[in-house]
UniProtKB/Swiss-Prot annotation:
Organism: Conus pennaceus
GO CC aspect terms: extracellular region
Swiss-Prot/TrEMBL keywords: Cleavage on pair of basic residues, Disulfide bond, Knottin, Neurotoxin, Secreted, Signal, Toxin
Annotated protein name in UniProt: Conotoxin PnMKLT1-1111
UniProt domain comment: The presence of a 'disulfide through disulfide knot' structurally defines this protein as a knottin.
Disulphide bridges: C53-C67, C60-C71, C66-C75
InterPro entries: Conotoxin
Family: Belongs to the conotoxin O1 superfamily.
GO molecular function (one): ion channel inhibitor activity
Cell location: Secreted
Tissue spec. comment: Expressed by the venom duct.
Length: 76
């Protein structure tokens, strides 16, 4: 019984701590995501969803943009 009560108190404390230490303006992040999504709906060229991966021997900046996921200044 004591262990159950201690667990309940611990969960309530951790929940309250999470709420108190949360970023105060996190709702602005959601608003920015909404505006970005709306802009992408109006301007489909701005969307990252339709962008395809790069083929071999194309200049790249990150491995996830290459079809092979290997980037050494060019897609391998």
């Amino acid at each position: 019984m004591k262990l159950t009560c201690m667990m309940i108190v611990a969960v309530l404390f951790l929940t309250a701590w999470t709420v108190v230490t949360a970023v105060p303006h996190s709702n602005k992040r959601l608003a920015n995501l909404y505006l970005k999504a709306r802009h992408e709906m109006k301007n489909p060229e701005a969307s990252n969803v339709d962008k395809r991966c790069f083929e071999s021997w194309v200049a790249c900046e990150s491995p996830k943009r290459c079809c092979s996921h290997v980037c050494l200044f060019v897609c391998a």
